[in-house]
Amino acid sequence: LNYAIEDSWDEKEFDKNSQIVQKLLLHAASAKNVPFSVCKATSFGHKHLFKKINAQQPLTDCEKLAHERVINRFRECCKVAKAHDVGLLIDAEEYNMQFAVDQIVMDLMNEFNTSKAVVYNTVQLYLVDGNERLQQMHSRATTESFHLGLKLVRGAYMQKERKRAQKLGLTSTICKTKSDTDANFNQAVAYC
């Protein structure tokens, strides 16, 4: 079950989104053929917060509290997922937010994926550094002894990523061709 809300704007809406995901997890637990519920990190917190963390900029006291609330929203969903043996898949975000999301999700995996994978992250292989990220996640899971839950995808934000790189005069974060993306994806599948 997928709760496809992203880009919410206020704390009440973020709380409501977390409650909806928890209800979807309970529904998935009662449905034999629904092993996962899916949500977006941006349904639990402001995009600007993820972007700021991703850019490793210092957070204000208010932003630190907002970040804690984001983590707590995720944590409540993870508790429901673990209690009812249903997977919670965190869908991918744009590149300028994804590292911040990865940090949260990996910390939650460390907390909830002790006996099996319950929390899952998404690795986008259209990103040039997709396999490097995958290997870093695997290394951390091995070092810290938790089960790594992953969904491998080619990617979803190609036009946005190209436009962002051009606008900012940056090297593109995505592979140049579909065949490069396919090679990245195949390498990731072989690694797993």
Regions inferred by a protein language model and the residue ranges of each:
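Positively charged, amphipathic and often flexible ligand-engagement surfaces
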Residues: 2-192
